[in-house]
């Protein structure tokens, strides 16, 4: 969904990074112009070279130590990292790096009412395809949580009564 909204709002295809090739393929299908598997140790360096010095902004939809570290490694001077995901962990960064890199870090859990209205305008206007949705019986809740932790879910899973 992030890829679709970024493309609709900017008119440009964003870049996607993930640990799962299936989700990277889904990102390409949604309009990502490039994808990087973050399990590849060369991914951040390749992205830096291919973008001419890094990205201007990164949205961390996971919110883990590893995903934040990757975002921090690919954002150029003056860039911004927006953490949306709630996976958990902590970050550590020398304080002088903030002013030296002119780096901004923000958290976002919900947007404003105006942003929600804009989002719905895009959805109603047919500019955003629905998110992939899989229904599973409630009895598979444990397996579903394991799949989420392992990064095997693309889109959303809805648990329904057995």
Say what each PLM segment does.
Residues 40, 62-63, 85-86:
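Short glycine-/small-residue-rich Rossmann-like dinucleotide-binding loops
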Residues 80-82, 93-132:
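Rossmann-fold dehydrogenase core element
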Residues 21, 69-72, 113-162:
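C-terminal hydrophobic helical "lid"/dimerization subdomain
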Residues 50-53:
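Glycine-rich phosphate-binding loop signature in dinucleotide/nucleotide-binding domains
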Residues 19-20, 87, 111:
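Residues in the short beta-alpha loop(s) of Rossmann-like NAD(P)-binding domains
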């Amino acid at each position: 969904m992030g890829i679709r909204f970024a493309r609709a709002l900017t008119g440009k295809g964003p870049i996607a990074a993930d640990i799962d090739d299936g989700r990277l393929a889904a990102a390409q299908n949604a309009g990502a112009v490039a994808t990087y598997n973050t399990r590849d140790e060369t991914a951040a360096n390749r992205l830096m070279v291919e973008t001419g010095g890094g990205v201007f902004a990164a949205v961390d939809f996971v919110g883990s130590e590893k995903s934040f570290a990757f975002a921090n490694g690919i954002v150029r001077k003056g860039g911004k990292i927006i953490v949306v995901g709630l996976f958990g962990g902590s970050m550590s960064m020398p304080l002088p790096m903030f002013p030296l890199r002119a780096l901004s870090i923000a958290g976002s859990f919900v947007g404003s009412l105006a942003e929600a209205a804009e989002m719905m305008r895009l959805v109603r206007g047919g500019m955003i395809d629905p998110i992939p949705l899989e229904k599973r019986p409630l009895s598979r809740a444990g397996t579903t949580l394991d799949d989420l932790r392992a990064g095997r879910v693309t889109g959303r899973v809805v648990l329904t009564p057995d």
